Each structure stands twice: as structure tokens, then as C-alpha cells.
Curated annotation (Swiss-Prot):
Name of the molecule in the record: Probable Xaa-Pro aminopeptidase NFIA_010500
Top-level enzyme category: hydrolase
An example Gene Ontology biological process: proteolysis
Catalytic activity: Release of any N-terminal amino acid, including proline, that is linked to proline, even from a dipeptide or tripeptide
Record-listed Mn(2+) 2 binding positions: D272, D283, E460
Length: 492
């Protein structure tokens, strides 16, 4: 009931004890933009100033009249909940005033593309204090600047995003806002967790659909297509990242996205694919056989090793734990398993770990934050050490497997959502390069090369850190449940 100021409850379906409730008030599902703005201001540690954010503009491809697919800037979305192009936003910290600016009405654009948001529609839809048209933006900022005191700053993310017309004496700060927003985004609120959970729900449906049909498929492209079809059919139009559907040796390529090779003669598929829901990501990886069971003992053994790595790490997730310690644990388990298989040799587990030899087979980090980005931001990277200025996600840089001291690494906090994604890979390139490195004496290359047809195994879930431990938000089948679905698919 629009504008009623209360939530009307409609019982839309009753099935035994399953009662699904729909809340019809607009306020119930509004993105908590105002709460986020206050959180960012608290991280800034100031009592006055103006935050100014620029949304994603409409942009054409180079040398083309065709627009690029729209993707909202995530920092802008965090303070607005607006997934529309060509918008702006200000937040007056002292007066606690969040203002959204929407595009001016353009008749030509409306005829061709449909009308843009009106002020009234935006005010009803979004959790902001006021909505104005873009034409008001310059004058509003000039008025704020005219009233500001000498200690107030205008906060922007990047120097390239400053307003066009400002008094020369107004001080700009393009350094403080980004880390403040990163710190705020690292801890998810209830609304954000619901979005990530829903993204995982749709992803699980798509992963299950692939398992049900994989034995009737001929190419990696069919796997990608069915995953996309299932997500879109269930309301998730966008993927959080490019789908990785690598079969055979392609499964050893961490970010393989060509997805254009035949499945025939391949043992395993590594499917790393996650839907996006209302701009929030899921990140899910499953590795499965192209048969009703594991095609070889080697494939089974590597899957079970990665399964053990993941289970042992997930069970230890709770607030106060250093994620880097879990990454070291994953390497220890990997080394022990690879020694049992005769792939690693000639030293103790600790000697091999300190040498870095295990990174040939487990070359990426154990995980990363998930949120508005699949590799989401936070106050500090999960595996960062004191003095480490590396910005990128831990999955994109070499793993710290033999770090001498982990005490400066950040601790897990309640409200964080992190992936746990161990993997074991047998890459021809990595093995060839390892022969030239100092730890080559620990690797039985003849034995390792027998595993190259497997490619690699990765298993990845999204884990919420809770007050009492953790919750696995990912429900995509794995292990024996996964195999049973593949087997049932033969008869369907």
C-alpha cells in the first residue's frame, strides 16, 4: 500500500506449513542507502563535509553508436541503491542530508529509450532524503560551498570526478573517501546478506541444472549457455563475473573464459560461475566428472583432497580468526595429500611449505571478500601483511604460503562474507617452469605429469562470518550429492 507508512502482509501461498509472506510496503525492501551514508561518515571520522559521488554515465563503444552494457559504479550504488545511468549524489554530513540527482527529462531520449526516473518515482523508490533533477546540482553545490566553514571538505573518490564549478578556496579531499567506503563495505548488513544469499540461491539452481544435463552435452559452450539461461529465467540477468567452464586441461587455467572446446575425451569440468542479484555477487565453483562417477582414481583422489582442504578451512571460520592462517592450513593439507600421492617428496611438510613448492599446484589465495564486487573491497585485503600495499584481491596474486609472520594479517569480523576456494591444478606451463626453480627437488615431475589430463579441481563456497561462527550461503551441490544428480540425469 503505497504511502501508507506501514507494511501490509499478504499470504500469497500456503503449502502445508510453508507460508510465504509478501511485504507490499515500499519501505520494507528499500536499499539502506542512508544507513550506509552514515556508516561511511563514521569511517571518515568527521562531523561536517560533503560527499560527492558520480554514477555510471551512458557510454558508447569506441567508434560506435552502440552503448556499452550498463553497470553501475559500485561505490555510487552503496550510497544510493540506484541502478540507473547518469545519476549523481551528495551527502551533507553535518545536516545528515542525502540527495539524489536524476537526469533531466529528455523527450528524444524518452521516445527512443523510454523515460528516465522522475523525481517522484525516485523519492518513492530509494532511501534518500530528497531527489532533484540534474539541472539543480551545480547550484546546490555552490550554495553548500558558500555556507561551508574552513574545516569542511568536499570528499570525492577520484580527482577526475570533482564537480565542474567550485570556489577556488574550497578544499577537496580525494584520498579519504575511498578507504572509508572500503572499510564500510567490508562488513555486510542484513539487506546485503539477503542479496548475496539470493544470488547464491539462483546460482545453485543453475549449477544443479548443469549437473542434471551435463552427460547430454558436447561442448563447454553448452554448459555456459545452460547456466546463463537458468539464471536469467530466475530473474538474475547479470553474472557477477565471466563464466569459467573449463574441461580437461582447461580446468588448470584459473580464469579460462573461452568456453569453446568439445567435452569429448575430457575427465572433469571446473565450472566457476555465480549470478548477481540486485548488484550483489555470488562466487561459486564446482568441479565434476563427465561421467556417472570419477573416471579415474587420480581424479577422485584430487577431488577428495581439495574437498578436505575446503572442509577443514570452513569449519574454522569465525570472528577473530586470521584468514591467512587458514590459507597456510590449506597448503599444509595440500602438501600432506600430494606427498601421499607421491607428487611431492624429499622433505618434511614444513620444509616443502617454506620452499613454496606447493604454489605450483595451489597458486592462488584461499579466498576474498564478496559483495557488490565479486572480489569485494574491505579495510584490508584478507591475506595482507603490515606494509603490504597490494590492492588486488588475494585470488589474483601469488599465495603467501611460507610467510614468516602472520600477526599483522587482518582478523575475520562478524558480517564479513568471504569465499573459501582451495584448488589443486596440474598445469603444463607451471610444471615446466617449476623445473627451473629452487624447490624443484621437492616435486616428482614424472608423477605430477600423469595428472595433467585432470586439469584441476577447485571447490568454492561463500561463507558469512556470524556472531557464533559461520553460515555457508552456498547451496550448490557438491561431493556425493553432486554425483547422484549426474547419475539421475542419465535416466531423465
Amino acid at each position: 500500500m503505497r504511502g501508507s507508512g506501514r507494511s501490509d502482509i499478504v499470504i500469497s501461498a500456503v503449502d502445508a506449513l510453508d507460508i510465504r509472506i509478501t511485504l507490499t510496503s515500499n519501505d520494507c525492501d528499500k536499499y539502506p542507502a542512508k544507513q550506509h551514508a552514515r556508516r561511511v561518515a563514521a569511517k571518515l571520522g568527521v562531523s561536517s563535509g560533503l560527499i560527492y559521488l558520480v554514477g555510471q554515465p551512458t557510454i558508447n563503444w569506441g567508434d560506435s553508436d552502440q552503448p556499452r552494457p550498463f553497470r553501475q559504479r559500485r561505490y555510487f550504488y552503496y550510497l544510493s541503491g540506484v541502478d540507473e545511468a547518469d545519476c549523481y549524489l551528495t551527502y551533507d554530513i553535518k545536516n545528515d542530508l542525502l540527495t539524489l540527482y536524476v537526469p533531466d527529462f529528455d523527450l528524444h531520449r524518452a521516445i527512443w529509450m523510454g523515460p528516465t526516473l522522475t523525481v517522484k518515482e525516485a523519492q518513492e523508490r530509494y532511501d534518500v532524503d530528497q531527489v532533484r533533477y540534474y539541472a539543480s546540482l551545480k547550484g546546490d553545490i555552490q550554495r553548500w560551498a558558500g555556507n561551508y566553514n574552513k574545516t569542511s571538505l568536499l570528499y570525492i573518490l577520484h580527482d577526475t570526478q570533482k564537480p565542474q564549478v567550485l570556489p577556488n578556496e574550497l578544499r577537496l579531499d580525494d584520498e579519504s573517501l575511498l578507504p572509508a567506503m572500503d572499510a564500510a563495505r567490508g562488513i555486510k548488513d542484513e539487506h546485503e546478506i539477503r542479496m548475496i544469499r539470493e544470488a547464491n540461491r539462483v546460482s545453485a539452481l543453475a549449477h544443479r541444472k548443469v549437473l542434471e544435463n551435463v552427460l547430454r552435452m558436447w561442448t563447454e559452450a553448452e554448459i555456459e549457455g545452460l547456466f546463463l539461461d537458468t539464471c536469467i529465467s530466475h530473474g538474475a540477468k547479470n553474472q557477477a563475473y565471466e563464466i569459467i567452464a573449463g574441461s580437461g586441461e582447461n580446468a588448470a587455467v584459473l580464469h579460462y573464459v573461452k568456453n569453446n572446446e568439445p567435452l569429448q575425451g575430457r575427465q572433469l569440468v571446473c565450472l566457476d560461475a555465480g549470478a548477481e542479484w540486485n548488484c550483489y555477487a555470488s562466487d561459486v565453483t564446482r568441479t565434476f566428472p563427465l561421467a556417472a562417477d570419477w573416471p579415474t582414481a587420480r581424479a577422485r583422489d584430487i577431488y577428495q583432497l581439495v574437498e578436505e582442504m575446503q572442509e577443514e578451512c570452513i569449519k574454522r571460520i569465525q570472528k577473530g580468526v586470521r584468514f591467512l592462517d587458514l590459507q597456510v592450513l590449506a597448503h599444509v593439507i595440500a602438501i600432506e595429500g600430494l606427498m601421499r600421492l607421491g607428487i611431492l617428496k624429499g622433505g618434511s611438510v614444513e620444509e616443502i611449505r617454506e620452499s613454496g613448492a606447493s604454489t605450483v599446484f595451489f597458486p592462488h589465495g584461499l579466498g576474498h571478500h564478496v559483495g557488490l564486487e565479486v572480489h569485494d573491497v574491505s579495510a584490508k585485503r584478507l591475506t595482507a601483511l603490515e606494509g603490504d600495499k597490494e590492492y588486488y584481491s588475494s585470488t589474483l596474486v601469488p599465495s603467501v604460503s611460507h610467510c614468516p609472520c602472520t600477526l599483522s594479517a587482518p582478523l575475520l569480523e562478524e558480517g564479513m562474507v568471504v569465499t573459501v576456494e582451495p584448488g589443486i591444478y596440474f598445469s603444463r606451463l607451471a610444471l615446466a617452469n617449476a623445473r627451473k626453480l629452487h624447490f624443484a627437488k621437492y616435486i616428482n615431475f614424472d608423477e605430477a605429469e600423469k595428472y595433467i589430463p585432470i586439469g584441476g579441481v577447485r571447490i568454492e563456497d561463500d561463507i558469512l562470518v556470524t556472531s557464533s561462527g559461520h553460515e555457508n550461503l552456498t547451496t550448490a551441490p557438491k561431493g556425493e550429492e553432486m554425483l547422484e544428480i549426474i547419475r539421475r540425469g542419465i535416466d531423465n
